[in-house]
């Protein structure tokens, strides 16, 4: 389903959902404000409802404003590209984290983040400037961060070896999380079970499930979405999510979410298929993780 009320004739992709419910705020990257040039992070909202009487599923979406997200947008957006928003709550220190992929003046992509405690009594956090995730930084393009369910391991995309691949690194639990993120660069490891000889990008983890995009052979065309399950200490061989999700065009930067009262999860992703409003649009679909993971 095309989220047409938050899409535009420009490119809208790289979304993230900070909270779950039947009214879901969604942060995503769009180049509409620069008429197709630079990408910035903006905010929308999705509504969905399942009528248990007649079995009808209703989906709607629109642009939205939110005081906290407006503060975040004002802090991070600039004349270069901001992509790949990713929200994280760290229960170990009680702080929220907003990660994103930032284009530098030189054109390379870097990972940056904001860190804050939950706003109290309507008082919004103040940010001087985003911090560089320097522990993952390199002279290549680094972006699209995600963490496993225990925040014990971080995964991200980089082209430091040529093609884009998915890298991983263990999180040092012995030091403050912010200090670890801002620490000196360390070597990340290629995940052999996830990567191919082609481009593998934009990982997103929900519980023990990972979705990502790849242009490896055997797909439906362009970039397709792939799925992997973490079991017995390792990720399974990825498999294509099939024609209900993928097309001969490009499917990109997926995320998985969940809403109370629904049996299935949902997946939101970007695609440049021709039935959209123009460029890349955001799409929504239901997904049964257990059934998908048992294929």
Segments predicted by a language model, with ranges:
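Short, conserved micro-motifs composed of acidic
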Residues: 1-295
């Amino acid at each position: 389903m095309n989220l047409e009320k938050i899409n535009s004739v420009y490119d809208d992709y790289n979304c993230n959902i900070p909270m779950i419910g039947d009214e879901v705020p969604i942060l995503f990257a769009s180049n509409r404000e620069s008429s197709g040039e630079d990408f910035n992070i903006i905010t929308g909202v999705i509504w969905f409802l399942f009528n248990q009487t007649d079995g009808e599923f209703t989906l709607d979406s629109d642009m939205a404003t939110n005081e906290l997200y407006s503060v975040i947008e004002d802090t991070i957006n600039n004349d270069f590209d901001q992509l790949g928003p990713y929200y994280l709550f760290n229960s170990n220190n009680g702080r929220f984290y907003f990660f994103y992929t930032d284009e530098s003046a030189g054109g390379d992509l870097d990972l940056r983040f904001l860190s804050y405690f939950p706003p109290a009594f309507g008082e919004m956090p103040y940010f001087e400037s985003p911090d560089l995730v320097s522990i993952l930084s390199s002279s290549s393009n680094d972006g699209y961060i995600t963490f496993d369910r225990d925040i014990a391991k971080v995964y991200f995309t980089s082209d430091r070896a040529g093609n884009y691949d998915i890298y991983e690194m263990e999180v040092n639990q012995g030091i403050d999380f912010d200090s670890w993120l801002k620490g000196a660069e360390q070597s990340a490891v290629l995940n052999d079970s996830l990567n191919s000889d082609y481009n593998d990008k934009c990982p997103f983890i929900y519980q023990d499930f990972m979705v990502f995009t790849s242009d490896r052979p055997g797909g439906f065309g362009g970039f397709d979405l792939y799925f992997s399950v973490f079991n017995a200490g390792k990720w399974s061989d990825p498999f294509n999510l099939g024609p209900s999700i993928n097309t001969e065009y490009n499917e990109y930067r997926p995320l998985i979410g969940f809403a109370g009262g629904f049996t299935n999860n949902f997946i939101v992703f970007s695609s440049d298929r021709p039935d959209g409003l123009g460029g890349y649009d955001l799409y929504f679909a239901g997904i049964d993780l257990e059934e998908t993971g048992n294929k």
